[in-house]
């Protein structure tokens, strides 16, 4: 049990959400994948699972009408909310001022597409201090947002996100399972992920057609021996690019053997160097094995000349 989150009574319920939306002339849109959480217990659960305390600096993507925002601020944390929809970004500070006025100084709102966010345009996260992402992500772009932020922010140390249940299962999938795929392996390059709970449809407005789940992620520390390759070093990203290229090729032709799927990238000797049987399929490889194969390709020269 986490005792760091006091129940202040300042969180949004269904009536609050609908009133705020009506006052601001806002309706949920499919374009931005908007489904607003209307249950205070759910947002407190998300924050509790994330382990947010007053010492944390939090990024939220897609704050919507502010349900989760207020739950994060309730802990005493400082946060930046990244919202793509201008009317919602404009409304959010007013909602915080109304329901939790003492927290307004701890909130920064950035009206921007999360896929375009960089340390340069979100200066609160531009230093080396670790931060956490806590979000109810738009289901149609959840995976691209996570991988983009992990690539651009070396100091994104952890996240707790709510996504479509099927997406959560894929993100946390392990080698050999039917749902293990590109998102699973690429996320494993950066750290470890697990599904930590499910969320029903009745806590949203409007109610989605799918169930949701929570995914918790912890990034590898720079000195963690489990970190594949140079995932958390200051390299120029070339090794990650090759590893991700291998992953895309292997899962783009999922039923083919590695030898067939990677024939334009990996020379035959690379498999021998890496100790990987080329008759295996990509769905059986761990991120460590993809990394070992990338290193072997580099030792053989230009992978584009594979025969």
From Swiss-Prot:
It is an enzyme of class 2 (transferase). One of its GO terms (cellular component) is cytosol. It is found in: Cytoplasm. Its EC number is 2.1.1.182. It catalyses: adenosine(1518)/adenosine(1519) in 16S rRNA + 4 S-adenosyl-L-methionine = N(6)-dimethyladenosine(1518)/N(6)-dimethyladenosine(1519) in 16S rRNA + 4 S-adenosyl-L-homocysteine + 4 H(+). S-adenosyl-L-methionine binds at residues 35, 37, 62, 83, 113, 136. InterPro entries: KsgA/Erm, rRNA_Ade_diMease-like_C, rRNA_Ade_Mease_Trfase_CS, rRNA_Ade_methylase_Trfase_N, rRNA_adenine_dimethylase, SAM-dependent_MTases_sf. GO terms for molecular function: 16S rRNA (adenine(1518)-N(6)/adenine(1519)-N(6))-dimethyltransferase activity; RNA binding. It holds the Pfam family RrnaAD. NCBIfam families: ksgA (TIGR00755). Belongs to the class I-like SAM-binding methyltransferase superfamily. rRNA adenine N(6)-methyltransferase family. RsmA subfamily. HAMAP family: 16SrRNA_methyltr_A. Specifically dimethylates two adjacent adenosines (A1518 and A1519) in the loop of a conserved hairpin near the 3'-end of 16S rRNA in the 30S particle. May play a critical role in biogenesis of 30S subunits. This is Ribosomal RNA small subunit methyltransferase A. The lineage of its organism: Bacteria, Bacillati, Actinomycetota, Actinomycetes, Bifidobacteriales.
